Amino acid sequence: MAMTPQLAFSRMPPGFRFQPTDEQLVVDYLQRRTAAQPCVTPDITDIDVYNVDPWQLPAMAMYGSDHDRYFFTMAAREAQARRTTPSGFWKPTGTKKTIFVVAGGHEVPTAVKRRFVFYLGHHQPSGSSNNNKTSWIMHEYRLMNSPRAAVPSSSSVNRLPTDDLTEEMVLCRISNKDLPKPPFIHNGLLQFSSVGLNGDGYNYLILDHLEPPAMEYPNVDIGNVDDAAAADDDPGDLDEEIDDSMQRNHGG
């Protein structure tokens, strides 16, 4: 029987908050998950993150802080990776960060962390797109020497295929810096008619149609998605610095 988010949280002690550092995510979760070893917490949800719109994800997560949710997913190897969802796509911003893990008294480069911003609309050739940036952020963690991911017998909500050597297991941290006001209902950007339930009982939105978005970032030319994403490089790096600083202050 699949564990629901409500059941998962009910098994945690009072005051429990899931706020792992980058190193903990890599060592205690991603490495152990790819080796089919039990993680510290019972489950981080397995789900096809790149086939689901980000606003559907929070209700599917087992663990997370007030603004972060964590998922395991299978992703194409970096050179072939496409991160397109039904309503938009994830665009990389900033620079990749190497995560070092202490082993044998030495810091060993073990994983790569990359930041993405979600854009509404479909990816088009440069100069011909009509996309709009949202406040949904994803940090993707990949092992530098990733083995083929094994599926433990107690795998969580959704089992993912693992026999394709062109794919690898990654860990994703999804957040929305504008919560609790989701961007998909801001200014009537998306219209929806009802709330439904998927097979596991999680809420999701049934979207009727996507209206042309209002411009929320007047200083960015969203007619060119590559330029718009490039304009995020410096803010993305700043977000990484703030994130790293907070982890150090909490002992990460």
From Swiss-Prot:
Residue ranges of every copy of the NAC domain listed in the record: 12-177
InterPro entries (UniProt xref): NAC-dom, NAC_dom_sf
PANTHER family assigned to the protein according to its UniProt record, in alphabetical order: NAC TRANSCRIPTION FACTOR 56 (PTHR31719), PROTEIN ATAF2 (PTHR31719:SF94)
Cell compartment(s), UniProt: Nucleus; Cytoplasm
Gene (UniProt): NAC23
Cellular component aspect of the GO annotation: cytoplasm; nucleus
Region span, Disordered: 225-252
Subunit field text: Forms heterodimers with NAC26.
Protein role: Transcription factor involved in the regulation of seed size. Possesses transactivation activity in yeast.
Pfam families given in the database record: NAM
Gene3D superfamilies: NAC domain
Primary residence: nucleus
Domain notes: The NAC domain includes a DNA binding domain and a dimerization domain.
Stated name of the protein: NAC domain-containing protein 23
DNA-binding region, residue intervals: 110-183
Biological process terms in GO annotation: regulation of DNA-templated transcription; regulation of seed development
Coiled coil: none
Tissues where the protein occurs: Expressed in stems and panicles. Expressed in developing seeds.
Keywords of this entry: Cytoplasm, DNA-binding, Nucleus, Transcription, Transcription regulation
MF (Gene Ontology): sequence-specific DNA binding
Listed Acidic residues bias regions: 229-244
